[in-house]
Amino acid sequence: MTWLETVSVTMDVSKNGFHRDLVTTVDFGPGFPDGLETLLVHRLPSGIYIDQYQLASLKEDTGLQVLLGSAVDLEAPAHTSEEFLVLVYPALDQGILKATLPIHGRYHKPSLAGKRFELVEIKLPKLILRTDTCTQLISFPPYKIVDAPCTVHNLSICQWLEIQHLQEQDPVSLEIPLGDGSLVEPVCAGTLLVTLLCCVILSRSIWMHGVFLDNAILI
């Protein structure tokens, strides 16, 4: 059994509410080579987003290295957004790496069927590996060769070895609160009624207490 066969990847979500941490842990076990570089490839669903400005701050504070596959609209609701690619370049420490990625729930359409939460599932990321000493990789089952940016700076493309046999884990899920769509009409009607009532009261107050001079009103 080679050290590649002992690699395991697990993922969990910490914190509550709309703002969570997606924590991925990779355990390589004994025998992994020196100079091993790792890349986690997340394909995240449209129901969540990542704040690139927060990532820039975390890079300075913690050294977190993240490359987004495309620009992320922080304000867009879930139904107008698309899934997106996130490349995480974590640091390996004594055969174990842990990458903590801050994620945020998007606004979802209100439910007309009384549904209170929308379940957003996040699948396990792909794990790909490379070393500077091995530049000519050979594909052999169950592993395959893929191309990806060499570093987070995205200046060049390298060959990586994608690990295929990872332990199966069910997707982790988030419950995103939904608004009650059945309340839209009553709320709109109530808002309109209150607005009209305020206009009537304000107009009556101006009419009763205003001083009319040459077609002008002085309060």
Regions found by a protein language model. Give the residues of each.
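C-terminal single-pass membrane-anchor helix
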Residues: 165-219
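Non-cytosolic ectodomains/luminal loops of secretory-pathway membrane proteins
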Residues: 1-169
